[in-house]
């Protein structure tokens, strides 16, 4: 309480309603062009949040844990939390996961913007608290910081807070989310030569995409390439196919051979190369990495938003009303069960989860 009272006094900006409206319009126009400047979003939230914050305050007053939070006004700042100690906690605690998230994405808990334009101490604290708890939301819902993951978390926050700025973020996010994304996923550490010109970018793809570059770059031996003239005798191709697998480790015995139209039941790919009017056999070598290709905007609209809405509705208490600081040394799964928090489904983890 004492810490926030000082923070409130040092950050309060006393301006009239007309000036606030002017700031709101200017920030809204600039947010789309510079979304990384989070203070713009914070200022717009400050000015537009009075009715929503009042409702949050009334909810917290009528909730035992919420009243405790309002009375003590805990903060995720260095003066109140020993962040280095959180890294020493067991790996499945909320505090450890929180620090791991911050370090993974190079974030700092104390960097969240303080509310500037509320004259009421409690209202100012509620909005400041909402911003500080935002990263806790990433952790407990298992969301990374991509545009689509941020948008999904904003939908959860809209359900829980009714803040207008969260609705704006949800509406704008699909236009800012990439249509298509290529992402290298490494099983181990990032190879030192990843950015070098001679790095072998072929991969084993979990979604069975064909690496188009590897079809063309014969000189780099990225794939085995096989050709035969087209024949109508199906038995010929059956024998050819068997011959290849009998000599799978002896490429000199099969190089210069191709299989046309034979049903492929292996983990390799047979595709039809339209320009050359021929079938190509691609030998997929096991790699320590894969190129993951997906459509973030489509995933956001069809999967992340529906999940986020249901996750927001099912949670029994908004995060800002929970005394998070008392849970930092507790098991994160226990925290989720206590408040019925549904983390990101496994099938969306590679696209939107914390990796």
Curated annotation (Swiss-Prot):
It is a peripheral membrane protein. Its EC number is 4.1.1.130. It catalyses: a 4-hydroxy-3-methoxy-5-(all-trans-polyprenyl)benzoate + H(+) = a 2-methoxy-6-(all-trans-polyprenyl)phenol + CO2. Zn(2+) binds at residues 134-135, 138, 150. Keywords: Lyase, Membrane, Metal-binding, Mitochondrion, Mitochondrion inner membrane, Ubiquinone biosynthesis, Zinc. InterPro entries: Coq4 (IPR007715), Coq4_euk (IPR027540). It is found in: Mitochondrion inner membrane. Its cofactor is Zn(2+). The keyword DNA damage does not apply. GO terms for biological process: ubiquinone biosynthetic process. GO terms for cellular component: extrinsic component of mitochondrial inner membrane. Pfam families: Coq4. Belongs to the COQ4 family. Lyase that catalyzes the C1-decarboxylation of 4-hydroxy-3-methoxy-5-(all-trans-polyprenyl)benzoic acid into 2-methoxy-6-(all-trans-polyprenyl)phenol during ubiquinone biosynthesis. PANTHER family: UBIQUINONE BIOSYNTHESIS PROTEIN, UBIQUINONE BIOSYNTHESIS PROTEIN COQ4 HOMOLOG, MITOCHONDRIAL. This protein may be expected to contain an N-terminal transit peptide but none has been predicted. HAMAP family: Coq4 (MF_03111). This is Ubiquinone biosynthesis protein COQ4 homolog, mitochondrial. The lineage of its organism: Eukaryota, Sar, Alveolata, Apicomplexa, Aconoidasida.
């Amino acid at each position: 309480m004492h810490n926030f009272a000082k923070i409130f006094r040092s950050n309060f900006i006393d301006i009239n309603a007309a000036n606030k409206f002017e700031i709101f319009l200017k920030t809204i126009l600039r947010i789309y062009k510079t979304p990384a400047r989070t203070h713009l979003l914070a200022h717009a939230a400050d000015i537009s949040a009075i009715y929503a914050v009042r409702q949050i305050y009334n909810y917290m007053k009528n909730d035992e844990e919420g009243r405790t939070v309002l009375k003590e006004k805990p903060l995720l700042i260095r003066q109140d939390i020993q962040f280095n100690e959180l890294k020493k906690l067991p790996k499945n605690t909320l505090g450890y996961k929180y620090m791991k998230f911050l370090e993974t994405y190079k974030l700092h808990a104390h960097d969240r913007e303080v509310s500037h334009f509320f004259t009421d101490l409690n209202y100012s604290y509620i909005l400041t608290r909402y911003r500080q708890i935002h990263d806790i939301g990433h952790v407990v819902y298992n969301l990374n910081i991509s545009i689509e993951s941020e948008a999904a978390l904003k939908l959860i926050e809209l359900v829980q807070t009714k803040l207008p700025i969260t609705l704006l973020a949800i509406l704008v996010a699909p236009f800012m989310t990439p249509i298509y994304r290529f992402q290298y996923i490494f099983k181990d550490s990032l190879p030192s030569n990843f950015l070098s010109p001679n790095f072998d970018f072929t991969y084993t793809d979990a979604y069975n995409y064909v690496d188009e570059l590897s079809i063309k770059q014969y000189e780099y031996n990225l794939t085995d390439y096989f050709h035969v003239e087209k024949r109508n005798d199906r038995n010929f191709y059956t024998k050819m196919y068997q011959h290849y697998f009998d000599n799978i480790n002896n490429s000199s015995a099969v190089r210069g051979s191709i299989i046309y139209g034979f049903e492929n039941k292996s983990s390799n790919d047979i595709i039809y190369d339209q320009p050359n009017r021929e079938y190509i056999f691609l030998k997929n070598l096991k790699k320590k990495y894969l190129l993951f290709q997906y459509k973030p905007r489509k995933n956001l609209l069809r999967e992340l938003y529906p999940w986020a809405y249901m996750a927001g509705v099912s949670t029994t208490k908004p995060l800002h009303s929970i005394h998070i600081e008392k849970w930092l040394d507790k098991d994160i799964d226990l925290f989720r069960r206590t408040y019925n928090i549904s983390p990101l489904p496994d099938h969306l983890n590679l696209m939107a989860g914390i990796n």
